[in-house]
Amino acid sequence: MPSDNQKNTNDLPLAGPRHVAIIMDGNGRWAKSRGKMRIFGHQAGVKAVRRSVSFAVNHGLDALTLYAFSSENWNRPAQEVSALMELFVRALDSEVKSLHKHNVRLRVIGDIGRFSPRLQERIRRSEVLTEKNQGLTLNIAANYGGRWDIIQGVRQLAEQVQEGILRPDSINEASLCQYICLNDLAPVDLVIRTGGEHRISNFLLWQIAYAELYFTDVLWPDFDEQVFEGALNAFAQRERRFGGTTPIDADAS
C-alpha cells in the first residue's frame, strides 16, 4: 500500500479530480496472454490496486472507488468466483493494517449480504478499524451494481412514504441522493476504465452523471503510476460545463 518513503505531495494537476473511480478490467486477458489461469490475473491485479491506492494517497485525492466485483460477476464459473472470494479475504487480511497506518478509511459498498459470513466479518472488521481515519477514503465496490444502488435507495424512500414520514410529491433528487452509496463524499469527477472497453458496466450510474470518462487499453495488472498520471493530465485538459455553456471550475463549486 502507500510507501513510507513517499510524501503526500498534493501535486494533482491544476483543477485535478477529488474523487476518482476505476473500472478494473483486463485481469483475465492479461493472464490468458501469459498462458495462465484467470485467477493468476486477479492476483496480479491486487498489485495494481496497491499501486493505485499509493498514488491516490501521495497525490492528495479525497476518494478512490474501485469496482472489484459486480453483481453480474456471479455468472462467472463457480471456481473463479470462489477463488475471487478467497482472494478478497486474503487481501483484506494482508492490507488493512497498512491502510490504517497511512490514514486510509476503507469502505465496502454493495450488497455484501450474499458473501460468506467469514468475508462479511473481515469487511466489518476492516471498516471499523479504519472508520476514524481522515486521509483517503478507499471504497471497494463488491457485489455492487448501479441499478441495485438506485433501487435500494428508492425502497428506503418508499418505506418512508408508507410510514407517513414522507409525502410522494416532496421527493426530489436530494431525497434519493441521501440513500445512494457514497452520498457523503465529493461527487465522482473522473471514471477510468482499463482493458480497452468503452462502457460503464452498471457502475455508479447515479454518481457519475457529470464525471469525465477516460478509457485506456492498458490491462488492469499493468496499470501503474504513469498511466494514472496520464488520466489525471487528460482530466485537467477537459472543460467541465455540468450542462451549461461555460466551463466551471470544480474547485469553486
Curated annotation (Swiss-Prot):
UniProt-listed Gene3D superfamilies: Decaprenyl diphosphate synthase-like (3.40.1180.10)
UniProt-listed InterPro entries: UPP_synth-like, UPP_synth-like_CS, UPP_synth-like_sf
Enzyme class: transferase
Cofactor: Mg(2+)
EC number(s) per entry: 2.5.1.31
Catalytic activity: 8 isopentenyl diphosphate + (2E,6E)-farnesyl diphosphate = di-trans,octa-cis-undecaprenyl diphosphate + 8 diphosphate
Binding site for substrate: 26-30, 38, 42, 70-72, 74, 76, 193, 199-201
GO BP annotations, alphabetical order: cell wall organization; peptidoglycan biosynthetic process; polyprenol biosynthetic process; regulation of cell shape
SS bonds (residue pairs): none
Keyword terms: Cell shape, Cell wall biogenesis/degradation, Magnesium, Metal-binding, Peptidoglycan synthesis, Transferase
CDD domains for this protein: Cis_IPPS
UniProt: Mg(2+) binding residues: 25, 198, 212
Manner of cofactor binding, per the entry note: Binds 2 magnesium ions per subunit.
This protein's GO CC annotations: cytosol
GO MF annotations, alphabetized: ditrans,polycis-undecaprenyl-diphosphate synthase [(2E,6E)-farnesyl-diphosphate specific] activity; magnesium ion binding
Active-site residues, Swiss-Prot/TrEMBL: 25, 73
Known function: Catalyzes the sequential condensation of isopentenyl diphosphate (IPP) with (2E,6E)-farnesyl diphosphate (E,E-FPP) to yield (2Z,6Z,10Z,14Z,18Z,22Z,26Z,30Z,34E,38E)-undecaprenyl diphosphate (di-trans,octa-cis-UPP). UPP is the precursor of glycosyl carrier lipid in the biosynthesis of bacterial cell wall polysaccharide components such as peptidoglycan and lipopolysaccharide.
Subunit note: Homodimer.
Family: Belongs to the UPP synthase family.
Name this protein carries in UniProt: Ditrans,polycis-undecaprenyl-diphosphate synthase ((2E,6E)-farnesyl-diphosphate specific)
Species whose genome carries this gene: Pectobacterium atrosepticum (strain SCRI 1043 / ATCC BAA-672) (Erwinia carotovora subsp. atroseptica)
